[in-house]
């Protein structure tokens, strides 16, 4: 922080402003030149006014810079050369200090201008030759990202295909086990049908044996009856005609044969109808089972297709979400960096403005000091001109 001080000391003297201050001079006036100490760039500048001692002379220049000397003319005449020389030295010292202050002010202005030039925006550089490289790198990054996403998608598709094949294998294995179970069930049904057929065949064999047994008994009865008929004595009796045994036996044989044939046909018809009924039931159940299996297979395939499509969509969604998150993170970091740069530049701009305001205030203060010094120099000049006129009048009166 640049500090300026204006110090004034005197034993019995006072300086006033232009609006009505007073200046006192006395015999043996002693002046001390004002001193200016300036640091680098105008910092730490200290201005102290001249010191003079007066005992009995006073003058006022409240409005018209008029001055009255009350000291004895003899004392002034005796110290005329010394006083004038002292005043001239003090005036020269004031002028030198003013020039030094102006030089310091000029240096300060140059430094302020240099500082503004350094802090201001420099000449714009041509970065157009970097744009192609940046665009190529961005294209490569984008291509690598797309390739990575494609590879990830292929991996997911391969995983889904493997899961699909595993599911299909498990499904086919389950179907194979189901078919084997159905085959085992049909084998049990076939065994039951075989047992039923064997039972029916045994029944037919029993009926055939029974028919053979009946035929045998019938033949034995016929043989017995024939033997009985052959051993009888022919006795002619005048009676009613007897029954024809051969005809009776023939009728019985025909009846038994008809009954046996009817039983055989009934058994064959029952066996055939039962077999056909069982075959129809087996065919109906088999067809229904095949339809149910085909329907279940179609539903499973549809479910697998939907699951594969769902997994593909979920994988694509996850990949897109990852890409979106990566893009948001990258552009968020870039935005934060740009925002930090903007904040830093705004802070620097605020510092520059504050420093510029401070430099302007210091400049105004220096200009005020310069104007006051110029006013004091003008006052001294008017006083010196008044003293020279007075001394000239005194010298002329003495000569006369």
UniProtKB/Swiss-Prot annotation:
Stretch list, region Necessary for interaction with PNN: 244-390
Region: Rod-like helical tail, residue numbers: 388-400
Spans annotated as Linker 12: 226-248
Phosphoserine: modified positions: 14, 22, 35, 40, 57, 72, 395
Annotated region (Head), positions in chain: 1-79
Phosphothreonine found at: 323
Record GO biological process: epithelial cell differentiation; intermediate filament organization
IF rod domain mapped to chain residues: 80-391
InterPro entries: IF_conserved, IF_rod_dom, Keratin_I
Region named Coil 1A: 80-115
One of the record's GO molecular function terms: structural molecule activity
Family annotation (PROSITE patterns): IF_ROD_1 (PS00226), IF_ROD_2 (PS51842)
Positions of modified residues (Omega-N-methylarginine): 7, 24, 32, 43, 51
Site, as annotated: Stutter: 267, 327
Entry GO terms, CC: intermediate filament
Top-level taxon of the source organism: Eukaryota
Keyword hit for Coiled coil: yes
More info: There are two types of cytoskeletal and microfibrillar keratin: I (acidic; 40-55 kDa) and II (neutral to basic; 56-70 kDa).
Assembly and interaction partners: Heterotetramer of two type I and two type II keratins. Interacts with PNN and the actin-binding domain of DMD.
Function: Involved in the organization of myofibers. Together with KRT8, helps to link the contractile apparatus to dystrophin at the costameres of striated muscle.
Record-stated family: Belongs to the intermediate filament family.
Domain notes: This keratin differs from all other IF proteins in lacking the C-terminal tail domain.
Name this polypeptide is given: Keratin, type I cytoskeletal 19
């Amino acid at each position: 922080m640049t500090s300026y001080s204006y110090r004034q000391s005197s034993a019995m003297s006072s300086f006033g402003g232009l609006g009505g201050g007073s200046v006192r001079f006395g015999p043996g006036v002693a002046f001390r030149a004002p001193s200016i100490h300036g640091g680098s760039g105008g910092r730490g500048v200290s201005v102290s006014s001249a010191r003079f001692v007066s005992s009995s002379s006073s003058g006022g220049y409240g409005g018209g810079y008029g001055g009255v000397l009350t000291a004895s003319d003899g004392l002034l005449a005796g110290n005329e050369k010394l006083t004038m020389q002292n005043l001239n030295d003090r005036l020269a010292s004031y002028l030198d200090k003013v020039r030094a202050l102006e030089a310091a002010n000029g240096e300060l202005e140059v430094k302020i201008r240099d500082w503004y030039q350094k802090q201001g925006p420099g000449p714009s550089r041509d970065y157009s030759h970097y744009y192609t490289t940046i665009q190529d790198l961005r294209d490569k990054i984008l291509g690598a990202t797309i390739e990575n996403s494609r590879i990830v998608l292929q991996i997911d598709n391969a995983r889904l295909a493997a899961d699909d094949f595993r599911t299909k294998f498990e499904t086919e294995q389950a179907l194979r086990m189901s078919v084997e179970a159905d085959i085992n069930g049909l084998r049990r049904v076939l065994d039951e049908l075989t047992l039923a057929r064997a039972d029916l065949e045994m029944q037919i064999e029993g009926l055939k044996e029974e028919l053979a047994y009946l035929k045998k008994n019938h033949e034995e009865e016929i043989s017995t009856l024939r033997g009985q008929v052959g051993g009888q004595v022919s006795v002619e009796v005048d009676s009613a005609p007897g029954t024809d045994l051969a005809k009776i036996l023939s009728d019985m044989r025909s009846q038994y044969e008809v009954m046996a044939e009817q039983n055989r046909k009934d058994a064959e018809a029952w066996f055939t109808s039962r077999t056909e009924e069982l075959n129809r039931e087996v065919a109906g159940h088999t067809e229904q089972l095949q339809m149910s299996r085909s329907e279940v297979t179609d539903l499973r395939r549809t479910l697998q297709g939907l699951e594969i499509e769902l997994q593909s969509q979920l994988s694509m969604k996850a990949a897109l979400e990852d890409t979106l998150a990566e893009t948001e993170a990258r552009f968020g970091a870039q935005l934060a960096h740009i925002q930090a740069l903007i904040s830093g530049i705004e802070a620097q701009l605020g510092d520059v403005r504050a420093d510029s305001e401070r430099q302007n205030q210091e400049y105004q203060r220096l200009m005020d000091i310069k104007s006051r010094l110029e006013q004091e120099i003008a006052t001294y000049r008017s006083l010196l001109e008044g003293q020279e006129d007075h001394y000239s009048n005194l010298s002329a009166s003495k000569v006369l």
